Curated annotation (Swiss-Prot):
InterPro entries: CAP_sf. Expressed by the venom gland. Contains 8 disulfide bonds. Residues 1-22 form the signal peptide. It comes from Varanus acanthurus. This is Cysteine-rich venom protein VAR2. The keyword Transferase does not apply. GO terms for cellular component: extracellular region. GO terms for molecular function: calcium channel regulator activity; potassium channel regulator activity; toxin activity.
Amino acid sequence: MILLKLYLTLAAILCQSRGTTSLDLDDLMTTNPEIQNEIINKHNDLRRTVDPPAKNMLKMSWGQHHCRECQTCSTEMQPKMSTHPVSGRKIGWVWVCGGKLLHVK
């Protein structure tokens, strides 16, 4: 779910920046170095426009290790319905991957 939202957001940004109305799936794949650079540049451009400006903001760069870790995590995630510890109500989905919990309401 989180990856879907991220891809839709990136697709919208890439459509605006390229001025196109239709994209092939290959145009959105983050395995493409051109797309990686476009994402990084857009992210860093947006961060430069922060007001007031941050004094210690680091420049973002692409990390292959993190890409592999995220890909593995996204294919191995097992969703479970989460319940509130006191009320017992169903409160959303929890994905477990490599000992990390991701909670989506």
